[in-house]
C-alpha cells in the first residue's frame, strides 16, 4: 500500500500476516497498523531550504569586490526524524576549496552540505547520507584592478621569493 502522510510518501509491503487466509481484513489491518506507526512516530524535517544559507556557511573570495559571500542551498535538504527526538541533526558544510578567485557567476557550486544520521533505526534506512550542493548566492565581480594587481604581486613574492 502507499500513502502520503506529513509530506512523506509511504510505501509498505507486509508479508506473512497471521490469519490472512481466514480473515480477509487481516492484510489491510496489518498494513494500516504499519502506516499509522510511521505517521505517528516520524516527521519530515527540512534542514536547509532551497535558496537560503545554512547557518554561517560562506566562502572567502580573492580579488573580488567582496571578501566573503554566503553559500545557499541548491535544493531542500530533508530528513526523516523521530517525533520528540532530542538529538540535534549533524550537518556539515564542506567547501570545494579554501578560497575562490573572482569573478564568480551566481549559483556557482562551491561545496556540499551533508547530513549524518546519528539516530539509526537498525542499520538505518539510507544507503548513503543525504547531501546537497551549496552554491554562490549572487555574482561576484572582479575587484578594482589595482587591488587585483597588488594581491597577485604579494602572492608572487610569498611563493617565489
Spell out what each predicted region is:
Residues 1-161:
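Domain-terminus/edge residues, biased toward the C-terminal soluble/receptor-binding domains
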Amino acid at each position: 500500500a502507499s500513502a502520503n502522510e506529513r509530506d512523506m510518501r509511504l510505501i509498505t509491503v507486509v508479508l506473512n500476516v497471521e490469519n490472512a487466509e481466514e480473515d480477509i481484513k487481516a492484510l489491510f489491518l496489518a498494513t494500516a497498523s504499519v502506516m499509522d506507526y510511521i505517521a505517528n512516530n516520524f516527521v519530515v524535517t527540512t534542514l536547509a531550504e532551497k535558496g537560503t544559507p545554512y547557518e554561517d556557511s560562506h566562502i572567502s573570495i580573492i580579488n573580488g569586490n567582496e571578501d566573503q559571500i554566503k553559500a545557499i542551498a541548491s535544493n531542500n535538504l530533508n530528513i526523516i526524524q523521530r517525533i520528540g527526538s532530542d538529538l540535534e541533526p549533524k550537518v556539515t558544510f564542506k567547501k570545494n576549496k579554501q578560497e575562490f578567485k573572482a569573478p564568480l557567476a551566481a549559483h556557482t557550486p562551491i561545496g556540499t552540505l551533508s547530513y549524518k544520521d546519528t539516530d539509526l533505526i537498525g542499520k538505518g534506512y539510507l544507503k548513503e547520507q543525504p547531501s546537497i550542493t551549496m552554491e554562490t548566492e549572487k555574482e561576484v565581480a572582479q575587484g578594482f584592478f589595482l587591488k587585483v594587481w597588488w594581491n597577485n604581486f604579494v602572492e608572487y613574492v610569498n611563493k617565489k621569493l
